[in-house]
From Swiss-Prot:
Function: This protein binds specifically to 23S rRNA; its binding is stimulated by other ribosomal proteins, e.g. L4, L17, and L20. It is important during the early stages of 50S assembly. It makes multiple contacts with different domains of the 23S rRNA in the assembled 50S subunit and ribosome.
Annotated transmembrane regions: none
A GO term from the CC aspect: cytosolic large ribosomal subunit
Family affiliation: Belongs to the universal ribosomal protein uL22 family.
Quaternary structure and partners: Part of the 50S ribosomal subunit.
GO process annotations (BP): translation
Keywords in alphabetical order: Ribonucleoprotein, Ribosomal protein, RNA-binding, rRNA-binding
Record-level Gene Ontology MF annotations: rRNA binding; structural constituent of ribosome
Protein name in the entry: Large ribosomal subunit protein uL22
Length: 91
């Protein structure tokens, strides 16, 4: 059974977050948490929080055992960009 968790509108570059996500793809939950704890990247706490949310969803909503869970699929896409406006004379 697939359990999903989302983190929308996170203020970090997708390229930086993908470096961390690639480390935990396909790993057991305990191993992924250990990797995230000792990875000194700015995306690590964000991904760790997301992983804990997914585990909570699995345990609480679907009554799954936490020891049998692993990261099957995890990915990072680009979010919306903030519009930047530079007010000045245009003529």
């Amino acid at each position: 059974m697939k359990v999903k968790a989302f983190a929308n509108q996170v203020h970090i570059a997708p390229r930086k977050a993908r470096l961390v996500v690639d480390l935990i793809r396909g790993k057991q939950i305990k191993e992924a948490e250990a990797i995230l704890m000792f990875t000194s990247k700015s995306a690590s706490p964000i991904i760790s929080k997301l992983l804990k949310s997914a585990v909570s969803n699995a345990v609480h909503n679907f009554k799954l055992d936490e020891n049998n869970l692993y990261v099957e699929e995890i990915f990072v896409n680009e979010s919306l960009r903030l519009p930047r406006l530079f007010p000045r004379a245009k003529g």
